[in-house]
């Protein structure tokens, strides 16, 4: 069973909300693109494509019995098909966790609620690095936040409630931020503070998430591993992470899926090709028993396909080379054009 077959099988299965793939090769790129492009409009496809290095590609080829192919070509194909590519199993499952608990956002504006300035700044950097926007909170929610947060708190985005923020401040701040129409997604950050239990904050966040199902919320809880072990035994509706970068990466994937769904399906442009010229070049190479084209022949093929190439000419001695360079215009480069070298 290859990736094409898996996508085709799961495309119209309503119980399957997302498709995760581990791939070493793409046997039929055209079929893969057709199936994946259609399916990713309905549900996300996350792919871990192995064989990025030359050694890895060689191992994949011997393991699967098929040619792994150039990784850049595979990467381009995945992007053109709307497939979200991940580069580790951890990233694959982190992204899957976000898609499992979050809706697709309506925009790319992110708000951050935190009880510590440092992680809030790191989350802000990650938001900007992923091409998303920090949501500019409007005056009304700012005034509402000022009414109950201490004077030392910051009501700008990121909203820093300061370290001593009680559970009630988490609840009211998150509710206020979610009510702002200019906010599409929210990151909630918690650092341990005396008297405030991580699990209590998490439960409050999940209760609010249930009341606001249309906006993605991700949690960053920089606390003990026991917290995450406890979550595994609980019914959750919010993805929780240890670090801000992981959470923001998940939001970026949601935004990537949003942008893909917005794309209109337009037919690929078709270009006229001088097939006779191309055929003549390859026939001559075959007649000469050559496996490679010369520089001149390569330029002929590119020109026949309508691809713009640099101005060129052929010189057989130094005088011809100087005259040709003067005609083309400087700077110029010189390459050997030989069927033997």
Please name every model-derived segment.
Residues 1-341:
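Catalytic-core regions of core metabolic enzymes
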